[in-house]
Amino acid sequence: MINTELHNGDCLEYMKKIPTSSIDLIITDPPYNLGKFMEERDTNLVKMRDNFFGAAGWDDLDYKEWKKSMNKFFHQASRVLKDGGSIIVFMAIIKVETIIQLAQKHGLYYKKTGIWHKSNPMPRNMNLHFVNSTESWMYFTYKTKTGTFNNNGKVLHDFIETSVTSNSEKKYGKHPTQKPEALMEHFVKVLSNENDTILDPFMGSGSVGVSAVKNNRNFVGIELDENYFNIATSRIKEVKKDEI
């Protein structure tokens, strides 16, 4: 039977309680620390920043504080990962170098930076500049240069294209940076095996958890915001059809 463990609170505190070398795969989408960056720009994105970016908690932190928090995250991530375990971290392209440097300090081997392309992005400011249709992700393994990689003989590109999150995946509520299940399921299937344990310390509305449970993986999720935690819990319960 697949086990799920969900926590509403600070991931830096809850991760300390996770046993060492107990996690096979981490997939997570931490705050991008774009809040203050957007606030200081003289554009009409300030309202979007107030409504969306600011809701992400760490996103409004001073850069040095955000970097310090991410360093603590990688310290715990490397501790809980099994040797040969993998981690996928979504991040703004302008922060990729910082994330790689922090991760490598904690024994994580940098494998790849890839792109998620949204095939139907919001056409916001389409007459002013190029529409924002991509986000980056980074792939690391712990203590080894290789890990689980279920490509089944296929060539898997580092450019992944899906539509944005559908309304059916938002029926319990919306999250401003919600990733589609199809995207998360891709990483779940390729980088883990059935009965492995997957962790998402920045769970949001639970797309990683839903994908993990659907594919017979154990799941540990942590989310600071109570509203998003409740959305994630409802989504995962629906898939699991069991009491968490």
Regions picked out by a protein language model, each given a short descriptive name:
Residues 1-122, 128, 152-244:
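S-adenosyl-L-methionine-dependent nucleic acid methyltransferase catalytic domains
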